[in-house]
């Protein structure tokens, strides 16, 4: 009876290499599906995996086939309905499958979209691919770590794509040498004895036959030692190492005034949740300062920032003044990379908008690496947007974006934090 022992600890990931190849090959279609799917999630469900749909025509392999139309000559099996040279009506053409939208029809056939699941890590990797904090500078004190993949020797477990052929063959040779060295020494002794018996007088036929049987048995046992075994396999090991970069702080300023209705607040929260996930996944030890404001600004913790029901009028400058105070108290611009993301519906007391312009231009923008303003509204822009447009024309580290619908959130987020070319700062 034969026994098969599977020593692979990663047997469930035997097709991981094919999965990674598929994700690379259809990355653009997968990212498009992810950007559509994120808009359908609740505010608190941004971090789990996702079921991804790809149109079947996008993953079809190229092939040569007969086009529709034209004249064709085929040989069909004979039957009692047709004879030689009869003309056969062309069959009805089938339509392509799709998402299920459209009207019903009696003819045609097709295929549904290809649907598969991606894990949480794959989802977040694709979600934040090619994003980075703009103008990040290495300051004197380094506490912010950015994770990068490095080679880290070899491991006994891994995916087939990372197998080290040379190291595996070295292990195979060492194992076969260790397992057969005693047998080969014994084989050499038996062959020497056989040669002596064959040349002896008188002939010792029984002893000669015994030696030949022992030699054949040893050779068979040596041959049964496998050339390569799963025990020999070694895989290139990779690990993520924290590389010192610069310490950074992100200020999150959210308008919670009475003009911000619940759908608008939800869109602002979605944006900030994306920002939080991006920072926590890409960097380590990033400080985040949460500021909520209506007529008064208040520094709060994460729980209160996302779930507090407090509301009131609108004075945007109160949040900017509080941010300026916190920077002066805790975050020296010479030691910190300072970032800010402000979300509002643009509704502000008219006399306060010029004050916001002055605070930003004189106190905040000269010391921050990047300041982004997101206006969430379906209405026409008001005085705050116009003041910020003047700032954008003057300062390279100031950006403004407009969100009208939930589906605008992710494209705006990527536009604000897309990787830029290396710059000297």
Swiss-Prot record:
Q: Which Pfam families does the record cross-reference, listed alphabetically?
A: DUF444
What HAMAP family has UniProt attached to this entry?
UPF0229
* Compositionally skewed regions (Basic and acidic residues) per UniProt: 68-90
Q: Where is the composition biased (Gly residues)?
A: 92-105
Q: Which domain of life is it from?
A: Bacteria
Question: What is the protein named?
Answer: UPF0229 protein ETA_15540
Q: Which family does it belong to?
A: Belongs to the UPF0229 family.
Q: Where is this region: Disordered?
A: 60-111
